[in-house]
Structure formats: C-alpha cells, structure tokens
C-alpha cells in the first residue's frame, strides 16, 4: 500500500471511513453542530415576537461569540493541562448542556439577563470542540492508518467539509419548514399561539436537545486512547 498518498476508488475510500467508528462520531457531531447553529438563526424571530425586542439579537450574538473566542484561545492550553482532547471536549459539552438547559428555564421565565448568562456559559463550554476538531480528525486518520495501513487524511477533511454544508442546509430547511408549518405570517405584528410555541421549540428546546446528543456522542469519542493502544500492539 502507498502510505504517503491516497489513491483509492470512491467505494474503497468510503469503506475506510465507515470502518472508523470515531470518524463516524465526528461526522454526526459535526452535522448536529451545524443544525444547532441553524436553529439559533431563529433568534431574530424569538427576539421579535417572544422577547418583543429585535435589537436583542446583537446582544445575544455577542453572548455567543465573545465566550467562544475566549474558549478557542484557551483550548491549546487546556488540552495540554487536561492531557488530551477527550476529557476536555466531554466536560466542555456537559457545561454546554447545563447552559442550554438554563437558557430554556430563563426563556420561559422571560429573564433576558439569565438567558444571556446561560448562553455565554453554553458557548464557552462548546468552544474546545470547535477549537480542536481538526486535530480530532487528524487523530482519526492516524487511527485508520494504524488499523489498515492506509492514509485517508484528505478524504476525511473533504467529507467533514461536505458534512458541514449538508448539516447547515438541513438545519436551515427544517427550521424554516417548521416555522411555516406553525402558521408564521411574515410582517405580522402578532403571531398565532402555535407559532409562538414553535419559536420556543426552535430557539430553546432544539439547541438544548442537540447539545445533549453531542455530549452523549463525545462520551465515546476517545480516539486518542485508541491510537495509543494501537501503537502499543
């Protein structure tokens, strides 16, 4: 086998990818992350009709972006301190899940300050996975090489990029479809009760559920340990 190059048919490359359970976990997580982002794009409707202040969208964007940037800057140091990505990512998403649960509680309370604080906590918790995703994919590729003797680095990155586009597209389409199904009327000052309930589902409940699902996946994504075990064989 030519270990320095990737010369496989589409079918052979696909087989190599699906044989790596850790890579499949990453792909599913990536898809869920993109759907998560799409549901947060419903924020403008939630701010306008539930919180009655469309200008809050910018404030909530800052509550996501600033903690995310801080977390990304800290990720390399935290990976080193925690002895790898597995524990850091898992604990980060546990924090993220707790944050999103609090966002749901705060949303029904109508407490904007608590919603903002909880949103920031969730974003901070999710940031390590965003920061080390490429390193995770590289580790997955190393695992495939150690178990099959074949390199699939480029194929893995390409499929992950494709997954990002698919996940974002699915999330946006589903969110838009559900909003329309609930009876949303563009430009109306007041929306129906069904539409208001759907806004709560899309902006509060769905992000929470998606975050919890990713957390469950991350519990098994210890590809670093698997690589070490393969090298010791």
Question: Locations of the language-model features?
Answer:
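Membrane-embedded alpha-helical bundles of multi-pass transporters/translocases
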Residues: 1-233
């Amino acid at each position: 086998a030519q270990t320095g190059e990737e010369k496989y048919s589409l079918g052979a490359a696909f087989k190599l990818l699906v044989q790596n359970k850790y890579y499949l976990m990453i792909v599913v997580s990536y898809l869920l992350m993109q759907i998560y982002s799409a549901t947060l794009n419903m924020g403008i409707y939630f701010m306008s009709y539930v919180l009655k202040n469309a200008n809050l969208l910018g404030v909530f964007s800052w509550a996501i972006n600033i903690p995310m940037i801080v977390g990304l800057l800290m990720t390399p140091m935290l990976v080193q301190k925690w002895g790898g990505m597995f524990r850091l990512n898992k604990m980060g998403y546990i924090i993220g899940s707790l944050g999103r649960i609090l966002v749901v509680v705060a949303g029904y309370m109508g407490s904007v300050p608590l919603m903002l604080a909880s949103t920031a906590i969730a974003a901070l918790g999710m940031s390590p996975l965003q920061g080390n995703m490429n390193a995770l994919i590289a580790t997955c590729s190393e695992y495939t090489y150690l178990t099959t003797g074949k390199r699939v680095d480029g194929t893995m990155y390409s499929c992950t990029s494709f997954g990002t586009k698919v996940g974002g597209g699915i999330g946006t389409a589903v969110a838009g479809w559900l909003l329309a199904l609930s009876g949303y009327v563009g430009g109306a000052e007041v929306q129906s009760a069904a539409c208001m309930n759907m806004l709560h589902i899309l902006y509060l409940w769905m992000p929470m559920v998606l975050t919890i699902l990713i957390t469950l996946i991350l519990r098994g994504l210890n590809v670093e340990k698997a690589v070490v075990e393969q090298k010791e064989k």
